[in-house]
Amino acid sequence: MQSTANYLWMLSDILGQGATANVYRGRNKKTGDLYAVKVFNSLSFQRPADVQMREFEVLKKLNHKNIVKLFAIEEEMSSRHKVLVMEFCPCASLYSVLEEPTNSYGLPESEFLIVSRDVVAGMNHLRENGIIHRDIKPGNIMREIGEDGKSVYKLTDFGAARELEDDEQFVSLYGTEEYLHPDMYERAVLRKEHQKKYSATVDLWSIGVTFYHAATGSLPFRPFEGPRRNKEVMYKIIAGKPSGAISGVQRAENGPIEWSGELPATCNLSMGLQTLFTPVLANILEADQEKCWGFEQFFAVTNDIFNRIVVHVFSLQQMTPHKIYINTYDKVPDFHDLVYKQTKIPGQNQELLFEGRRLVLEQGRLAQHFPITTDENPIFVLTREMVSVIGLRFDEIVIPKPISHYDLDVDANMAKAVTGVACYYCRIAASLLLVLDLMRKGIRWLSELMKEEYNENVHRNTEVSLKLNFCNRTTEKDLKIYEQLMQTSVESEVYAIHAKLLNLSSTQEGLKSSLQEVKNKLTPGGTLMDSWINTEGIHAADRNVEKLQVLLSLITEIYCQFKKDKAQRRLSYNEEQIHKFDKQKLCLHAAKAYSLFKDECVGKYEVFRSKTLEWMRKMIHVRKQLFSIKSKCFDIEEEASKCQHYINQYQEKMSPKMFAAPSGMKSAVNPIYSSPNTLVEMTLGMRKLKEDMEGVVKELEENNHILERFGALTIDGDFRNVDCI
């Protein structure tokens, strides 16, 4: 045990080891509270005195929630060496988090955002105080749990830190080689002399590597044998990285470098966040310091990302979930643009559904006032046009094959890899289940939407039919009355209008048969019935995710034992036999997990996807058919209105002739009516006209009554209204 005036610690209770110091878990002598005590070793005292004091001076200047706090600088009682008493973070470092098999393929999106936000905030505080860190890596980012249960990450280990303004440079070498800027790597690792100086932006390179590591679970630049086994190739990769690339991997010995400007498919981050973060990585992982972003631009872009809100969207026809990162002040057109960038569905073609209803967003509505969405309750987007069924983006990773011979180190590493893949299977299986649950929900809603569209068409078609019938009867009666009363032929235009009305009626009758065809597809037994969604694909009742989790727990248990075996370095005969039996069990559990994932989860998902493609084709055809009927119905109604308008004008034109002054009437009537009963015949004709007009009024009233009753009718007796938000 060692101690200072106010703190004590056990030498066996070590938290971390570095080149110049060890960190122990210590306690305050009076309160018993836990602290991290940094004790410097003999190598530390070989440094110049000003360098030794630099860490103390830097920590004294800093005070931020995302930087490990310095509480005291005291002397160890026996050696009188300085020790730092700092804030204790009980959840270890980001490196420890990334070493967990659960995070083998990167942190969950929510945790990645916390890491990146906290690191950016901590770095911003450093730059405000004119300090560079020079050794940023996951091992120097500590984690604790905040009062709200969320992680809080803090920068630590300022042994390499120094004061340096943005326009200043330095030549001394610090850092961890996997995270070093290429210029520093060349001199510090390869020991090649050059005259280059370094600026504060070298921290940005280290941040880029750290963020990539956090997002994917792997380092971005990897020689075949590993970064520390082939340093020449490592330098070749980082120094020769093309602009825009964010990773370079050598897959085989002496093989080519595979460059990529995207994060891998195994990454946990949504495409929405990847689209925003990938340019950040590309511009800070830039070997040319002239091309690399400065801190000001880095802080501006990252804070813009952190200040956005997420709108969860599900593209029904593409079977793809999306997260739309949007500014709170952005409006509906901006939202449609962002949806287009991820789905390639043009804004004018996007139809939105939310909680089973049409979602109509006014153009001026701010994003902060959109409906609250989640992964399980997103806004559904669809279109009347045919789009490809894409599905969830993932890789079918194969379980690593174990080696046959006995090797504790290799077995522990293999068990860790198997555990990581099993965790990945669990995550993807849960995602596939969620996608299919959303598909089932969306297809039911879409079926209801098509029924609504059908009912609207039937309603409109009935209105048009009644209007045409009325126009036809009115025209026929007018023709008959005018010919009887006026005893002369009617203008040819009236006959043409009558013929046009008859033709429109014939076309409208054709629409009825088209509607009946659509109805047959939508009703039970039709080709667009959605009953198949209840039988195909993965279901929660299958409990595949739970089965995978059981296998994962068995695999994890063996992995933990293998870690202990590795730490022992040598096992007794009985322990060795148990180890071999566990290895066999590990292979058996892994094979079961792979079979369950591939056959039950991915296999059934693919069947559902192919069925979806077939159903969507039929759905698009029916919706286009309904749209065509609606368009034709509108055209017929428009033409009927023109005919009705002409008839009304003709009636107004003929009325003065029918009811002209007696003198005028005589001249018109005398040649026609030679009978002495002319006046009686005219009176009877006028009465007949009055009766016909009263009949027309009565028919109009009856038609209106029919329309009012029809307004409540649908296929299933439930007419749903548009939901306008």
Swiss-Prot record:
Residues 309-385 form the Ubiquitin-like domain. GO terms for molecular function: ATP binding; protein serine kinase activity; protein serine/threonine kinase activity. Keywords: ATP-binding, Coiled coil, Cytoplasm, Immunity, Innate immunity, Kinase, Nucleotide-binding, Serine/threonine-protein kinase, Transferase. Its EC number is 2.7.11.1. Disulfide bonds: none annotated. CDD domains: STKc_TBK1, TBK1_C, Ubl_TBK1. It comes from the Eukaryota. Pfam families: Pkinase, TBK1_CCD1, TBK1_ULD. ATP binds at residues 15-23, 38. Residues 9-306 form the Protein kinase domain. Residues 635-709 form a coiled coil. InterPro entries: IKK, Kinase-like_dom_sf, Prot_kinase_dom, Protein_kinase_ATP_BS, TBK1_CCD1, TBK1_ULD. It is found in: Cytoplasm. SMART domains: S_TKc (SM00220). One of its GO terms (biological process) is positive regulation of type I interferon production. Its main location: cytoplasm. The keyword Hydrolase does not apply. GO terms for cellular component: cytoplasm. PROSITE patterns: PROTEIN_KINASE_ATP, PROTEIN_KINASE_DOM. It catalyses: L-seryl-[protein] + ATP = O-phospho-L-seryl-[protein] + ADP + H(+); L-threonyl-[protein] + ATP = O-phospho-L-threonyl-[protein] + ADP + H(+). Belongs to the protein kinase superfamily. Ser/Thr protein kinase family. I-kappa-B kinase subfamily. Comprises A N-terminal kinase domain, a ubiquitin-like domain and a C-terminal coiled-coil region mediating homodimerization. Serine/threonine kinase that plays an essential role in regulating inflammatory responses to foreign agents. Following activation of toll-like receptors by viral or bacterial components, associates with traf3 and tank and phosphorylates interferon regulatory factors (IRFs) irf3 and irf7 as well as ddx3x. This activity allows subsequent homodimerization and nuclear translocation of the IRFs leading to transcriptional activation of pro-inflammatory and antiviral genes including ifna and ifnb. Homodimer. This is Serine/threonine-protein kinase TBK1. The lineage of its organism: Eukaryota, Metazoa, Chordata, Craniata, Vertebrata.
